[in-house]
Swiss-Prot record:
Catalytic activity, reaction form: 5-(methylsulfanyl)-D-ribulose 1-phosphate = 5-methylsulfanyl-2,3-dioxopentyl phosphate + H2O
Entry's family note: Belongs to the aldolase class II family. MtnB subfamily.
Biological or metabolic pathway of the protein: Amino-acid biosynthesis; L-methionine biosynthesis via salvage pathway; L-methionine from S-methyl-5-thio-alpha-D-ribose 1-phosphate: step 2/6
Species annotation: Leptospira borgpetersenii serovar Hardjo-bovis (strain JB197)
UniProt gene name: mtnB
Keywords: Amino-acid biosynthesis, Lyase, Metal-binding, Methionine biosynthesis, Zinc
The name this protein goes by in its record: Methylthioribulose-1-phosphate dehydratase
Length: 250
């Protein structure tokens, strides 16, 4: 698919996500990367996602993180990159087979509370072992699946650095991460797969909120160790709890 077609596809998705309430106001951003190229296209800052067009995307050099002047001659005048551009870059730098990134601010992802902090910036949230996990290619019966939750640093670059380090060290089982009190970033090999993954992710988080299916119902902190986890589950980060605001369920 050509760059033009992919940017048109992202523009359509932006309108859909805005309608779904996943990109309220000007929140969130969308990106594509043509595999083998030295950069990626990402939606600019301060744009309403229900009116995106191909001139609303900037080309960013993957290595430097800077705009590529020769690629941005036809973009909308005055368009600037969002600070969250670095989140997309982190995914592309860590995972070289990824061609699309979707960063949205869903309500459910903002209700998640874990034990992250500036000093412990990554936690693991156990996902429910439900059928929709097959969208991610997980076919094992009753799998133990965790998603990383990243601390919402005031400086977005710190979030990006943390995410990139995690993705490089631990091969992700699911194609998304949660940024606490912020939103989710979902990825895929192309726009079709990334969108499919986002729909599945939204369903899972809605399921968890609706059913109050806490990963640790006794409220005890459960830390994986060398003795109580399998090789695939072994991580150097904490397993998250999943408390939510009480008013959420009134």
């Amino acid at each position: 698919m050509s760059v033009k077609k992919q940017l048109e596809k992202l523009s359509i998705l932006g309108a859909t996500y805005h309608k779904n309430g996943w990109m309220p106001g000007t929140a969130g951003n969308l990106s594509v990367r043509i595999l083998g190229e030295s950069g990626f296209w990402v939606s600019g800052s301060g744009l309403d996602k229900n009116t995106l067009n191909k001139r609303n995307f900037l080309y960013v050099d993957l290595k430097s993180g800077r705009l590529s002047p020769s690629k941005n001659t036809k973009v909308e005048k005055g368009l600037k990159p969002s600070a969250e551009t670095s989140i997309h870059r982190a995914v592309y730098c860590a995972l070289d087979d990824i061609g699309c990134g979707l960063h949205v601010h869903t309500l459910e992802s903002n209700l998640i509370r874990t034990n992250t902090s500036q000093h412990r910036p990554v936690a693991l949230l156990e996902l429910p072992a439900i059928e929709i996990l097959k969208v991610y290619g997980i076919w094992k019966e009753s799998p133990k699946v965790y998603v990383p939750v990243i601390y919402n640093f005031p400086n977005v670059q710190d979030i990006s650095d943390c995410l990139e380090s995690y993705l490089k060290e631990y091969k992700p089982v699911v194609p998304f991460c949660i940024i606490e009190k912020h939103g989710i970033t979902v990825w895929g090999k192309d726009t079709v797969q990334a969108n499919r993954n986002l729909e599945a992710t939204d369903f899972i988080l809605k399921y968890m909120i609706s059913s109050r299916n806490l990963s640790n119902p006794e409220g005890k902190k459960n830390f994986p160790t060398e003795n109580n986890t399998s090789e695939s589950d072994r991580q150097k980060v904490y397993v998250a709890e999943f408390p939510v605001y009480p008013a959420t369920f009134l």
